[in-house]
């Protein structure tokens, strides 16, 4: 196996340069939520003599005034994780925003696309509308104040699709946001349901990206109990997988072929075991609707979907790229939750990727997909 020293030496000789940083020291690993290297700025990523601007499409934030509208349910919104305090970055808290930017610098991330995991899908229409209004206003403020460092996906009240259409229109055309962050379903209602089609039609019309970030399937809560936080480690990838498979098998992606979708966490399990889907209707025709005739094999829809690179190992990233293509993979970290401690190093150290592929994953694909031209 190639050592890290040998890889770095070889990479430098081949036109790829990067600065390796030990981002998480012992104090951070033992529970401190403060990043130990906030004053450290990584050297720029250089590929073939050109600087690569790195764009993280999967980063989170929260706003306390929006959460407060949840009433008695507000206490359950903040995730039970390291990095939870760093979610709160209102423009009015300059110190918090500067700490976020410093943490990005330490990771080598030039721009984050902020998003808020939907916590309002069970609320009534008016409450959800008020939460989304605050979220999108705060996200737009941050994006306007730091246009070279921060942009965002809007929040939507998808439990009221007609309202979501209006919110998306405003977010893209008036607030300068890049798309919308949505769950893996709307409180168990899957996205292929025709009630959601107006929202997908509007997203396609606007060229807006839909970032699917999962939530643990509530119907499996009993089985997820116990040690290991299985509701997240298994539940989240599973939720994304189910969401994507329904969009494929129910013909939603045929109906909206121009829909731009990014799936978090490498698309869940779909990228790892997609070929099984190509055989399901042959093996069990009774479980497939004869009125739904897909235009291509299920696996061929993967090149209509984008996947973040949050898959942890070089081998997992190699396999994801082999399955979906490097053009469909974008950088994602889940920041400020410390799932991915060395996102740039992860991509750079995956030796099966060409220089062009690494540059594309680190920022080129996201810039093209999100129409980011100010970096």
Identify the residue ranges that each predicted region occupies:
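Mid-to-C-terminal alpha-helical segments outside catalytic/metal-binding sites
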Residues: 2-53, 57, 63-111, 137-144, ...
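Active-site gating loops and adjacent loop-to-helix segments of metal-dependent hydrolytic enzymes
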Residues: 51, 63-94, 218-240, 277-302
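Active-site neighborhood of phospho(di)ester-bond hydrolases with catalytic His/Asp-centered motifs
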Residues: 55-57, 115, 153-154, 181, ...
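Histidine-centered divalent metal-coordination motifs
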Residues: 58-60, 213, 265
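Active-site environment of divalent metal-dependent phosphoester hydrolases
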Residues: 62-64, 120-122, 159-160, 188, ...
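Active-site gating/metal-coordination segments in enzymes
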Residues: 110-250
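Alpha-helical structural signal in soluble globular domains
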Residues: 138-145, 170, 174, 198, ...
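Active-site region of glycoside hydrolase catalytic domains
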Residues: 247-262
């Amino acid at each position: 196996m190639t050592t890290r020293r040998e890889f770095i030496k070889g990479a430098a000789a081949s036109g790829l340069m990067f600065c390796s940083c030990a981002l998480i020291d012992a104090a951070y690993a033992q529970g401190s939520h403060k990043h130990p290297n906030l004053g450290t700025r990584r050297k720029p990523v250089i590929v073939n003599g050109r600087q690569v601007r790195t764009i993280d499409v999967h980063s989170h934030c929260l706003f306390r005034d929006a959460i407060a509208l949840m009433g008695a349910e507000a206490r359950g919104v903040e995730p039970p994780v390291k990095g939870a305090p760093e979610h709160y970055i209102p423009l009015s808290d300059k110190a918090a925003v500067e700490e976020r930017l410093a943490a990005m610098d330490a990771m080598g991330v030039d721009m984050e696309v902020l998003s808020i995991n939907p916590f309002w899908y069970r609320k009534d229409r008016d409450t959800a509308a008020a939460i989304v209004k605050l979220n999108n206003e705060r996200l737009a403020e941050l994006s306007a104040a730091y246009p070279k460092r921060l942009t965002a996906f809007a929040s939507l009240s998808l439990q009221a699709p007609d309202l979501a259409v209006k919110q998306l229109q405003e977010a893209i055309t008036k607030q300068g946001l890049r798309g919308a962050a949505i769950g893996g379903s709307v409180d168990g209602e899957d996205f292929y349901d025709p009630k959601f089609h107006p929202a997908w039609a509007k997203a396609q019309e606007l060229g807006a990206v839909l970032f699917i970030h999962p939530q643990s399937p509530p119907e499996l809560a009993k089985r997820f109990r116990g040690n290991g936080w299985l509701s997240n480690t298994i539940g989240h990838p599973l939720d994304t997988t189910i969401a994507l498979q329904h969009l494929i098998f129910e013909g939603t992606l045929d109906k909206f072929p121009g829909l731009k979708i990014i799936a978090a966490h490498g698309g869940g399990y779909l990228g790892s075991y997609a070929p099984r889907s190509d055989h399901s209707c042959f093996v069990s025709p009774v479980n497939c609707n004869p009125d739904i005739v897909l235009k291509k094999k299920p696996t061929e829809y993967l090149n209509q979907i984008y996947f973040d690179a949050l898959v942890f190992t070089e081998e997992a990233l190699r396999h994801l790229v082999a399955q979906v293509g490097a053009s469909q993979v974008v950088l994602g970290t889940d920041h400020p939750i410390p799932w991915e401690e060395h996102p740039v190093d992860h991509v750079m150290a995956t030796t099966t990727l060409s220089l062009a592929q690494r540059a594309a994953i680190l920022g080129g694909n996201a810039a093209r997909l999100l129409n980011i031209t100010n970096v």
